[in-house]
Regions:
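Extended catalytic cores of very large enzyme megasubunits
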Residues: 1-162
């Protein structure tokens, strides 16, 4: 069973104005960049994005705790998730942009592709002669979930293609 914030808690935020600031520019950037398209064809509102992100975070935490039998405390989780929601909604802290975009979506919830939460990654070409495809496979996989990938040139001229 997945984690969900209580309906009564969420109800308080549905009509509350988010403090985007910057004379409307903050909301414009949010709508363009982080608000996901819902099944009904409409974009998420801020309260929905925050709900998706917080629930996705606590789903990930719950899976980990239950997998290792660490003792999930539903009441404590609900309380701390509500505090997290409140702080994100009021922009006291914000997750990284990749977290706003990916957390709580099918990428993380169904496919387990938590790499999509990373902004960037690095791969070395130092051992190209041992495994020619490894750095390029990593680059492709990471790029496909939106991660920017940097690399070095240590493997340059370590083999000849004829």
């Amino acid at each position: 069973m997945s984690f969900a914030l209580s309906d009564n808690f969420i109800e308080k935020y549905k009509r509350k104005r988010a403090p985007f600031g910057f004379n409307g520019l903050g909301e414009l950037v949010y709508m363009r960049t982080y608000s996901r398209l819902k099944e009904d064809g409409k974009n998420e509102m801020w309260w929905e994005t925050v709900q998706r992100v917080v629930q996705g975070t606590y789903n990930m935490q719950k899976k980990h705790i239950e997998r290792y039998d660490l003792g999930w405390n539903a009441w404590q989780a609900q309380r701390s998730a509500q505090e997290m929601y409140e702080r994100i909604f009021n922009m006291k802290f914000l997750p990284p942009g990749r977290g706003l975009w990916s957390m709580g979506t099918a990428l993380t919830e169904e496919k387990g592709l938590y790499a999509a939460l990373n902004n960037c990654a690095f791969v070395s070409t130092n051992n190209l002669k041992d495994d020619l495809s490894k750095p390029f496979t990593f680059l492709m996989d990471a790029s496909m979930v939106g991660v920017g990938v940097g690399f070095d040139t240590k493997g340059a001229e370590s083999f000849v293609i004829r």
